[in-house]
Each structure stands twice: as structure tokens, then as C-alpha cells.
Design a protein with these regions (language model features):
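Acidic/His- and Gly-rich active-site-bordering loop/insert found
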Residues: 2-102
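Zn-dependent metallopeptidase/amidohydrolase metal-coordination segment
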Residues: 7-11, 345-360, 421-479
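His/Asp/Glu-rich mid-to-C-terminal helical/loop segments that flank catalytic regions of hydrolases
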Residues: 36, 157, 222-240, 271-274, ...
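Active-site metal-coordination/substrate-binding segment of hydrolases
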Residues: 64-146, 151-162, 202, 317, ...
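Midchain, well-structured core segments that form catalytic/ion-binding scaffolds
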Residues: 102-105, 145-146, 156-367
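Active-site-adjacent substrate-binding region
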Residues: 225-227, 232-250, 403-446
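Substrate-recognition/cap regions that form aromatic- and gly/pro-loop-enriched pockets
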Residues: 343-432
């Protein structure tokens, strides 16, 4: 199979056009202009609100003018991540894709199918002339990945439909009817630097090759967190060396909503201890590889000497390492409802650590399907960093989306799926934030579902789209549109 044979052709044509447009989160200007031009070229009513959300209206197929207006929604931004050795500028370069069996992938970068494929499906519907449907509003929100900015800023009344299909889910055959709320915690350790004592040897230690992934949807897949592993080594080694280890820098992770997949630390030890530290690192690497022998089979541990540099003051460095060692990470509780007892309810992910000249900045992300538990988890993380002397702030929270009892749209979506594929879809919640949570606050009467084609390893350079599921989602969506129209 080559790219010219991908089906539905109209959807993949639109996806290819989208991937020519740089669209990092918070930098969606080119995508907004593309969507405006698209709507105007097709003579469709096109609106852009103050936040940068785009809405394109398409009138009903003749004979279905009195049908319920249905909203199709996706987000226009993408997570930008690449392999360390790949030369790529997400603000200028087009995503380069290729077919690998039944999967569409990108060459060394994130693919942008989250949520570019949702946008492509909407554009294909807007461009098509042979689909039966009632009135449609296609909505494209901005900056979903780094703050849900578009959904936060959307005012009541921008959308007018009473049913909404969110096209930002990642497992075909699953219809999502609820999602987790979330919040981020930001901790900063301020420090002064000093010269290391005489007789110290400087070492650089790195870890890469982890799977990473989405910190909500992938948090229960027993994937390693690069930050927690590197902090664990620092804590262990400092204990072995009677507190003599001196830290220079700690850098790992890029996005608040991704499990960090690589990282690097620079530190100094006494000359007399350097060979023991190398031996300890090798033993530690072997132990960690064994712990994750199923889920992380490409871990790469490296240690080398490096140039001397001013070290972080001892008291702050030790408290920073202890805080990272102590802070909760991973899935913490599962849902109490028997029907979804397998699903993660509450989790936390230490997402990024960045060292500047005089401070270390940490971002951790908390999620829960129960808002009171979200608050408690956020306070737990906050307390760990406060105890260590950090300056802590908490970001805006976004709400959970609760399952709607007797949802007409859910019923229509399930029946359409059964009609097409002869089996029931799985109706479930997701342990990740969807814009549906915010929509449910602004539009409390809005009936919503979320589904999409199968994606794997989102938010990483290994992101992949399962090609056959795009046509399945396309057929499913068209059947729902016909059902609503009739």
C-alpha cells in the first residue's frame, strides 16, 4: 500500500494538506488562515471567535433542512516531539509521512494525527457533495494540547447545535461518553551556584529510548518515566556517597501531557568515587531494564565524563532530588463503579524538569474522573514540593465530563455501529482530558460522544495511525449523520 491508495481518499488528501501546515500548540495562525480560506473557497459560512476557534457551517442536504443541527469538533494544534538526532523545525517544516504496513507514520517526528485526522474528516465532509445530512457545524479549536485554550475561551452561543461528536479519541470501536478532569502543578526551586570542591570529577548521565506516551491514556501501561528513573539514581547514589554528590543540572521532558521519554543529568563526585559510580550506574541500568523488560525494550543508558561547571547549592539540590523521589507518579486509584472498575480514576505524571542558571522548573500533571479527588491529588503533589522548599503554583483546572443518562446521540452512535459492523462498540470513559468537559460547562444541554480512528504512541515520534480504521470511522460518522437527518 502506498499513500496514493489510502482510503477514504478525500480524508487522506485533506490530512496531507494539513500536515504541510506548521501548527504547534499556541502557534496555530497558519492553520486558522487555512481553515478560513477553505470555508470561503467552498462558499460556506465561516466564523473565527476571539480565541481563534474556527466554525464552518454547512447547510443541510435538500429535504433535511429541519433536522437537528449536529456539531463535529476537533482541535487544530499538535504535540511537537522528535527524535534527538532529527533536524526538524515544527514552526517551518512539513510533516513527512510514510506507510508501514497498515500504519501511517512520520519520519522521526510526531505524526500530527492527534488531532489532524479529526480535522481532515471534518474538512472531507465539508468538501463532499454526496453525503446525506442535516445542518452541520464543523468546529476547530485551538491549543487543546497545552491548556485547552480554545475550549476555555469559547463563549456560549458560538455553537448552536444540540449534539456534538468529538473526533479526538484514539481507539476505533470505542465510543467515549465521559472523560477525566485535569490540572497542572508547577514547582520552582531557586538556588545559587558555587564551584565544586577540589578533587571532584564531573559526569553526564543520560537515558533515552523510552516509549513515553500520553500521560492520561497511556498512564496505566507500565511505561517508565525518565524523570523518576534519573531522580531515583541520584537519590540512591547520594545516599551511598554519604551526601557528597553535587548536582549541576537535570533536564527531562518537554510537554505537560506526555510521559517523559528521555533525560540527562550532570553531576560531580569525588575522584575517588568515580569508578564506583560507573559500576553503580551499570548495575542500576540492569535492574531498571529488568523491571521494564516487557514494556520498555529499547532503553538506552549512557554515562560519560564532562567538563567542570558550577554546581547547585547543596541544600537545594538535595531537597529537589528528595522531592522527585517522593512525589506520586502513575495510576493511583481505579474507578469504583463496577462496570468500569478497570479504568484509572486518578493519576499523576511528573512531566518535565528544566534547569536554568539559578532555578529548576518542574511541571506535574494530575488527572481524575472525580473532581474532589483531582483536588486532593493536586494538593498531594503540591505538598511534596512545598515541604522541599519549592515555590509552587497550580494551573487552571479543566472539568471532567460526566456520562449523560439516556443520551440520544449515544444510542444513535451504537445503533449505527451495529448496523455497519454487526457488533456492539464499547461505550466507556477515558482517563484523559477532552474538550467535552469544558463544553459540558458552557453548554449543559449538549449531548456528546467522542470517537476516532486508532492511534498508537501519540505525543511521541512513534505516533502511528491505523489506516483501515479511518474508513471505518468515516462510514460510522456518515451513518450517524444520515440517522440524525432522518
Amino acid at each position: 500500500m502506498n499513500k496514493s491508495e489510502l482510503k477514504p481518499a478525500l480524508v487522506f488528501e485533506q490530512f496531507a494538506k494539513i500536515n504541510e501546515i506548521p501548527r504547534p500548540s499556541k502557534h496555530e495562525e497558519n492553520m486558522i488562515e487555512f481553515l478560513k480560506s477553505f470555508g470561503e473557497a467552498h462558499q460556506l459560512e465561516t466564523l473565527v471567535d476571539e480565541t481563534g476557534n474556527v466554525l464552518i457551517r454547512k447547510a443541510a442536504t435538500p429535504g433535511y433542512e429541519h433536522a437537528e443541527t449536529i456539531i463535529l469538533q476537533s482541535h487544530m494544534d499538535m504535540v511537537c516531539d522528535k527524535l534527538v538526532d532529527v533536524d526538524f523545525d515544527f514552526h517551518k517544516d512539513a510533516i513527512q509521512t510514510y506507510v508501514d504496513g497498515e500504519w501511517l507514520k512520520a519520519k522521526g517526528t510526531t505524526l500530527g494525527a492527534d488531532d489532524g485526522i479529526g480535522c481532515a474528516i471534518e474538512l472531507a465532509i465539508l468538501a463532499s457533495n454526496d453525503i446525506e445530512h442535516g445542518p452541520i457545524e464543523c468546529v476547530f479549536t485551538r491549543d487543546e494540547e497545552t491548556g485547552l485554550t480554545g475550549a476555555h475561551g469559547m463563549k456560549a452561543g458560538f455553537m448552536t447545535g444540540k449534539m456534538l461528536i468529538n473526533l479526538d479519541s484514539e481507539d476505533e470501536g470505542e465510543i467515549f461518553v465521559s472523560c477525566a478532569g485535569g490540572q497542572t502543578t508547577h514547582a520552582t526551586f531557586h538556588f545559587s551556584r558555587e564551584e565544586a570542591p577540589a578533587g571532584y570529577f564531573f559526569m553526564e548521565t543520560s537515558l533515552k529510548g523510552l516509549n513515553g506516551g500520553h500521560s492520561g491514556d497511556d498512564i496505566n501501561k507500565k511505561r517508565a518515566n525518565a524523570i523518576k528513573i534519573l531522580a531515583r539514581f541520584l537519590f540512591l547514589e547520594n545516599e551511598k556517597l554519604d551526601g557528597s554528590l553535587r548536582l549541576v543540572s537535570f533536564n527531562s521532558g518537554k510537554m505537560h501531557n506526555a510521559i517523559p521519554r528521555d533525560g540527562k543529568i550532570v553531576f560531580a563526585v569525588k575522584n575517588a568515587d568515580k569508578e564506583q559510580v560507573r559500576a553503580d550506574w551499570n548495575i542500576f541500568a540492569s535492574e531498571v531494564e529488568d523491571e521494564f523488560h516487557v514494556t520498555e525494550q529499547a532503553m538506552l543508558f549512557n554515562m560519560s565524563s564532562t567538563d567542570a561547571a558550577p554546581v547547585i547549592e547543596k541544600a537545594v539540590a538535595d531537597k529537589f532530588v528528595m522531592a522527585l523521589q517522593a512525589v506520586d507518579n502513575g495510576p493511583l486509584t481505579t474507578c469504583q463503579d463496577e462496570a468500569i472498575a478497570w479504568m484509572v480514576e486518578t493519576s499523576s505524571n511528573v512531566a518535565s524538569v528544566m534547569t536554568d542558571e539559578n532555578c529548576i522548573n518542574i511541571v506535574a500533571s494530575q488527572r481524575s474522573n472525580v473532581m474532589s479527588n483531582l483536588e486532593n491529588m493536586t494538593n498531594t503533589v503540591k505538598a511534596a514540593f512545598l515541604l522541599a522548599g519549592a515555590e509552587v503554583t497550580v494551573g487552571d483546572k479543566y472539568p471532567a465530563w460526566k456520562m449523560r443518562a439516556n443520551s440520544e446521540l449515544t444510542d444513535l452512535a451504537v445503533k449505527a455501529y451495529e448496523k455497519l459492523f454487526g457488533k456492539k462498540p464499547l461505550v466507556k470513559g477515558i482517563h484523559a482530558g477532552l474538550e467535552c468537559g469544558l463544553f459540558s460547562e458552557r453548554y449543559p444541554e449538549l449531548d456528546m460522544v467522542s470517537f476516532g480512528p486508532t492511534l498508537r504512541n501519540v505525543h511521541t515520534p512513534d505516533e502511528a495511525l491505523l489506516i483501515p480504521t479511518v474508513e471505518m470511522v468515516w462510514d460510522h460518522l456518515l451513518e450517524i449523520l444520515r440517522s440524525v437527518a432522518k
